[in-house]
């Protein structure tokens, strides 16, 4: 299994020492200061390199949609993958604005997207209905994890030093809610939200599906991998693999919202040291995301009321991180500027 690369604590300490002598009152840049120091630890440099983000969107369908859990039909997954390929989705606009590498990976789209200029790593055409049976077999789960690992390797080989995973899959908030409930012990009423905007009847269907799925595995002693197979989805497993491989290679991941956090929880059961390589981007408007973040011991940078997925919330936060690094590297020290430091 994966083993996360150790942090370079000497580089982090050197970065903190630099922060202490920059021309500003100590701590006056707030979280931006420690963010820069975290990148120092991740990169092994007291003055980290500018950030080169890579965004990978994993797409798959979910059998649980037959339970009436989504406001949109499953065909939307295929249609949105076409939209990604054509550059018309929100994450495409954000990637262009950030000059970020963007890759779309089909790990389980039910429709035919074989002619599109994306990465084709389809494990199967959608997961099974998790309310009635295991969403994936153990072999399918491992194949999806490996698709995510391979995507992380491609991104890093292309020069990325910051990873963002996005998701596309009608029904995936239901799978994510089931995972978060199982892994945290939280009640479905606290975790299951409206996702793509279901009405009250749809919300009741989602809660019923999650409760049925949880009851199906209630007496089983499941490992993290088993839980992912029983209650997850192909793109969720791929995102987990993406995070794990990034950490093994020494590249941090900026975690998006509800689905990405469910994947991170699963990945953390596989490698607890993964925590050191994750950074939460935003607090989603989706019910239960706060519970997932608490379980991950991650603190989001912003709360903009977003709940789109695709990696969009994480992408919006990339400029904050880029500015944190630029401030750290570009500001003068008191000695360099000829400015008097704090009086003894």
Curated annotation (Swiss-Prot):
Q: Does the keyword Glycosyltransferase apply?
A: yes
A Pfam family hit? DBI_PRT
EC number of this enzyme: 2.4.2.21
Q: Which terms in the Gene Ontology molecular function aspect does this entry carry?
A: nicotinate-nucleotide-dimethylbenzimidazole phosphoribosyltransferase activity
EC main group: transferase
Q: Which reaction does it catalyse?
A: 5,6-dimethylbenzimidazole + nicotinate beta-D-ribonucleotide = alpha-ribazole 5'-phosphate + nicotinate + H(+)
- CDD domains, per database record: DMB-PRT_CobT
- Gene3D superfamilies xrefs: 1.10.1610.10, 3.40.50.10210
| Record pathway | Nucleoside biosynthesis; alpha-ribazole biosynthesis; alpha-ribazole from 5,6-dimethylbenzimidazole: step 1/2
InterPro entries, per database record: Nict_dMeBzImd_PRibTrfase (IPR003200), Nict_dMeBzImd_PRibTrfase_bact (IPR017846), Nict_dMeBzImd_PRibTrfase_N (IPR023195), Nict_dMeBzImd_PRibTrfase_sf (IPR036087)
Q: Does the keyword ATP-binding apply?
A: no
Q: Where is the active site?
A: 310 (proton acceptor)
Keywords from UniProt, A to Z, are:
Cobalamin biosynthesis, Glycosyltransferase, Transferase
User: Which GO biological-process labels does this protein carry?
Assistant: cobalamin biosynthetic process
Similarity comment: Belongs to the CobT family.
- What function does the entry list? Catalyzes the synthesis of alpha-ribazole-5'-phosphate from nicotinate mononucleotide (NAMN) and 5,6-dimethylbenzimidazole (DMB).
* PANTHER family in the record: NICOTINATE-NUCLEOTIDE--DIMETHYLBENZIMIDAZOLE PHOSPHORIBOSYLTRANSFERASE
The protein, known as = Nicotinate-nucleotide--dimethylbenzimidazole phosphoribosyltransferase
Instruction: Give the species this sequence originates from.
Output: Chromobacterium violaceum (strain ATCC 12472 / DSM 30191 / JCM 1249 / CCUG 213 / NBRC 12614 / NCIMB 9131 / NCTC 9757 / MK)
């Amino acid at each position: 299994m994966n083993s996360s690369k150790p942090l370079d604590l000497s580089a982090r300490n050197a970065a903190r020492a630099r922060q202490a002598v920059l021309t500003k009152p100590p701590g006056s840049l707030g979280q931006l200061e420690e963010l820069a120091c975290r990148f120092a630890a991740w990169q092994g440099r007291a003055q980290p390199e500018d950030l080169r983000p890579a965004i990978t969107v994993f797409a798959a369908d979910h059998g649980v949609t037959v339970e009436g859990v989504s406001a949109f039909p499953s065909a939307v997954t295929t249609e949105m993958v076409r939209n990604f390929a054509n550059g018309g989705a929100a994450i495409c606009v954000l990637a262009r604005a950030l000059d970020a590498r963007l890759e779309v990976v089909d790990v389980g789209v039910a429709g035919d997207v074989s002619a599109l200029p994306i990465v084709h790593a389809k494990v199967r055409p959608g997961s099974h209905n998790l309310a009635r049976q295991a969403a994936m077999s153990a072999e399918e789960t491992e194949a999806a994890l490996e698709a995510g690992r391979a995507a992380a390797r491609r991104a890093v080989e292309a020069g990325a030093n910051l990873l963002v995973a996005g998701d596309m899959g009608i029904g995936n908030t239901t799978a994510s809610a089931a995972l978060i409930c199982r892994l945290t012990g939280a009640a479905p009423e606290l975790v299951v939200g409206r996702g793509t905007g279901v009405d009250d009847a749809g919300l009741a269907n989602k809660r019923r599906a999650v409760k049925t799925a949880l009851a199906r595995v209630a007496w089983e002693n499941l490992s993290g991998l088993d839980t992912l197979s029983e209650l997850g989805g192909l793109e969720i497993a791929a995102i987990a693999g993406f995070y794990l491989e990034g950490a093994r290679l020494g590249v941090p991941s900026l975690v998006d919202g509800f689905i990405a956090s469910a994947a991170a929880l699963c990945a953390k059961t596989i490698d607890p040291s993964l925590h050191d390589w994750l950074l939460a981007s935003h607090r989603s408007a989706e019910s239960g995301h706060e519970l997932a973040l608490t379980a991950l011991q991650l603190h989001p940078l912003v709360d903009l009321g977003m709940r789109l997925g695709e990696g969009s919330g994480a992408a919006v936060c990339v400029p904050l991180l880029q500015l944190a690094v630029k401030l750290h590297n570009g500001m003068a020290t008191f000695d360099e500027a000829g400015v008097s430091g704090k009086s003894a």
